[in-house]
């Protein structure tokens, strides 16, 4: 690491130009190739997936995206001559637009079912030639503009569907800008130097920007969800600025000790840079743990996020030292430079609030530890009510046309019309057709069913489908129960004695199947992530207790963050106020991605905190001193890093995307809890209570473990010399604090 840092400092212009060339080249390639994101929730082997394949084979004309144009009259009927004339003309214009395959009108012979019972709401179905992921935003906008052109006093027109949601996609990068600005303010307050505060941001932006373009190219090679670039940017900005902050802090410490700019930058990368690489590796390993689930949808998310972390780490240990050499001593504030020139290098002694807090934790570990546990328990309680499901356009903000179309359909035709179940089967002969006719009658009397469409056969007569509309909303537990009832009770009885094998599909059933698969694989996934993280910490700190405590802290942080997400998004505490739409279930893939990201981020703080304690333990063998000094020296930088990360994560609530907002709030809550409760309260309290047992490792395991070190051996001796003055002064302070008052 020292050699790499020295090369980057000595050839700083080359290092900067190489990064700019990489950023420009990848961005240009992404602009030429375009994006190819896909939200494919299909899971091999599920019933909904099988139903989708049968439907595609028997009814290929249904393969395009299907959207709705909904209109509502404030008075009178949608069958009024003027309304019918206006909307018929509008639908004809939509049918002539590029990309539109067919338009079904409620005014056609078979359109009676598309008019509400009160006659005030009607809808038309617009089928595109392509799937939603292949539809150009301009095509969707043309449909919206044409439909909206029919609005007048008393006639309201709204549009819903996957393609229509493309027109609601927020433009610009407000969330990223807000996050970066807040981070810059925090960095300036921490450093007192404008130049030093801008370097972590510049480093993170180059690394994340290169990764953002790289993810667009990655979408051409594998399935990558459309939210993956934003998720990568969210995580990348957070960890990228943090990693650079740690290195700049160490560099500034070297300058204050009198080192040259080159020596300070080289030492910072050789020491803290190693911790950054180790921390980044833990994040990547946690993210790649998603590959064990073998779900195509999540593989792309894992690789995309991992790519972002890798590039931010690389920028932190190569681009950053080059930039540090450019600004020279201006990494220090004017006051620090003046003090250094007047008084020379001074030993750093932990003082102020950090030192007092560390001493308080040492004196009251049981009380403060119990308080921290109580906070974690309260925040984690809502997690017990976690319900997985997929949000739909009913969760969109009330100002969007997709949400208003959803509500109009639910009010006019019942809540289930927004999430029907599709039944598909192969048909072998007359007996099967007779059984399907009987099934139609049976379904109409089944609990939870609002209506059933007549059976429709393909042109060859070998595949049949019918649509079941529930009497409950798509996100309701009653709808999920209806799907289970059909699969386990109603359909097996109808199939008895026939060759039928009716499959229950549709978007709602597909989401339920996806959630079931995720829940089934979650224990294995969590075990793999925890196991790999513990193994890394075991190798780094050669202790059994440190990895086990880290695993427990990570589980606590995850549970508490899920509790916050459940309260905001599932229970709806403030979701409408924040512009996040109405309450609904939690996305089924959120726990998997959150466990990966949070375990990685939590390991970061664990590494930076415990590595300093471990260094002190190796030098003194005094656990109480190691914990006290480690907490006092790292708490300020960890808290500054946490404030930056929280600011970046919360800024993504402004993205307008419900999924990204979930990630932002969950990550912000977890980092806040981790930094201000777990790492500065519970972890040191437990380490004080456990004493030397923190560092226990069985002899047989000690002999077999390979040796890796976050701090390089050559820096260990230098650290001992460097801290001699600090040790002496701290001991004097301790002695003075313990001595009784005298009479002088």
Which residues fall in each region the model found?
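Membrane-embedded transmembrane helical bundles of large multi-pass transporters/channels
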Residues: 1-35, 100, 117-121, 131-388, ...
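Short active-site-proximal "capping" loops at secondary-structure junctions
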Residues: 23, 38, 74-76
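Short, conserved active-site loops that position catalytic residues or coordinate cofactors/metal ions
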Residues: 32-34, 66-73
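Short hinge/gating elements
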Residues: 36-39, 391-393
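Structured non-transmembrane domains adjacent to transmembrane bundles in polytopic membrane proteins
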Residues: 45-66, 74-161, 385-576, 607, ...
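Short beta-strand segments
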Residues: 70, 125, 249
């Amino acid at each position: 690491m020292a050699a790499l840092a020295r090369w980057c400092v000595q050839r700083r212009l080359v290092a900067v130009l190489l990064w700019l060339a990489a950023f420009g080249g990848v961005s240009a390639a992404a602009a030429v190739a375009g994006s190819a994101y896909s939200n494919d929730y299909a899971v091999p082997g599920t019933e909904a997936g099988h139903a989708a394949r049968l439907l595609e084979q028997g009814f290929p004309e249904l393969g395009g995206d299907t959207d709705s144009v909904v209109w509502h009259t404030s008075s009178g009927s949608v069958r009024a001559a003027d309304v019918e004339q206006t909307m018929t003309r509008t639908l004809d214009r939509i049918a002539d637009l590029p990309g539109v395959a067919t338009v079904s009108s409620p005014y056609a012979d078979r359109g009676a079912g598309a008019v509400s019972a009160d006659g005030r709401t009607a809808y038309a179905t617009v089928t595109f030639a392509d799937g939603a992921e292949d539809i150009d935003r301009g095509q969707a906008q043309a449909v919206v503009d044409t439909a909206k052109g029919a609005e007048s006093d008393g006639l309201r027109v709204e549009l819903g569907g996957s393609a229509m949601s493309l027109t609601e996609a927020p433009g610009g990068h407000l969330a990223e800008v807000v996050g970066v600005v807040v981070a810059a303010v925090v960095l300036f307050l921490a450093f007192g130097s404008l130049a030093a505060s801008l370097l972590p941001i510049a480093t993170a932006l180059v690394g994340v920007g290169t990764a953002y373009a790289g993810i667009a190219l990655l979408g051409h090679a594998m399935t990558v969800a459309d939210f993956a670039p934003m998720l990568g940017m969210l995580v990348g900005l957070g960890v990228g600025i943090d990693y650079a902050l740690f290195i700049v802090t160490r560099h500034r410490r070297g300058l204050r000790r009198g080192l040259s700019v080159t020596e300070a930058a080289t030492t910072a990368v050789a020491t803290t840079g190693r911790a950054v690489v180790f921390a980044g590796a833990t994040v990547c390993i946690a993210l790649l743990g998603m590959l064990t689930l073998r779900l195509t949808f999540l593989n792309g998310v894992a690789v995309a996020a991992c790519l972002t972390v890798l590039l931010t780490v690389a920028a932190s240990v190569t681009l950053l030292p080059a930039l540090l050499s450019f600004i020279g001593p201006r990494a220090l504030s004017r006051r620090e430079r003046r003090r250094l020139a007047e008084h020379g290098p001074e030993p750093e002694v932990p003082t102020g609030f950090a030192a007092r807090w560390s001493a308080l934790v040492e004196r009251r570990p049981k009380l403060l530890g119990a308080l921290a546990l109580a906070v974690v328990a309260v925040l984690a309680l809502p997690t017990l009510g976690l319900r997985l499901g997929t949000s739909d356009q009913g969760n969109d903000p009330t100002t969007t046309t997709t949400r208003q179309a959803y509500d109009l359909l639910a009010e006019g035709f019942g809540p289930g019309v927004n999430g029907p179940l599709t039944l598909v089967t192969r048909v072998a002969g007359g007996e099967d057709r007779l059984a399907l006719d009987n099934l139609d009658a049976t379904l109409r009397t089944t609990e939870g069913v609002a209506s059933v469409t007549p059976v429709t056969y393909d042109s060859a007569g070998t595949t049949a489908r019918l649509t079941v509309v529930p009497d409950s909303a798509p996100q309701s537990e009653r709808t999920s129960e209806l799907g289970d009832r059909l699969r386990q009770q109603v359909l097996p009885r109808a199939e008895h004695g026939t060759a039928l094998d009716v499959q229950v599909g549709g978007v709602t059933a597909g989401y339920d199947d996806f959630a079931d698969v995720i829940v089934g694989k979650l224990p294995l996934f969590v075990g793999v992530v925890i196991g790999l993280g513990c193994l890394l910490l075991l190798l780094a700190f050669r202790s059994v207790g440190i990895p086990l405590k880290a695993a427990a802290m990570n589980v606590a942080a995850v549970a508490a963050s899920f509790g916050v997400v459940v309260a905001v998004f599932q229970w709806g505490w403030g979701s409408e106020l924040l512009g996040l739409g109405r309450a609904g279930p939690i996305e089924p893939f959120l726990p998997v991605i959150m466990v990966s990201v949070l375990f990685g981020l939590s390991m970061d703080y664990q590494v930076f905190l415990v590595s300093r304690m471990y260094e002190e333990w190796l030098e003194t063998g005094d656990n109480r001193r190691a914990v006290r000094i480690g907490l006092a020296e790292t708490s300020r930088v960890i808290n500054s890093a946490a404030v930056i990360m929280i600011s970046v994560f919360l800024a993504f609530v402004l993205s307008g995307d419900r999924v990204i907002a979930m990630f932002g709030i969950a990550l912000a809550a977890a980092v806040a809890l981790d930094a201000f409760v777990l790492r500065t309260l519970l972890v040191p309290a437990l380490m004080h209570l456990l004493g030397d047992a923190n560092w226990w490792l069985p002899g047989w395991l000690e002999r077999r473990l390979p040796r890796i070190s976050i701090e390089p051996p050559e820096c260990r001796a230098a650290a001992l010399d460097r801290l001699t003055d600090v040790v002496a002064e701290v001991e004097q302070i301790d002695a003075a604090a313990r001595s009784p008052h005298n009479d002088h």
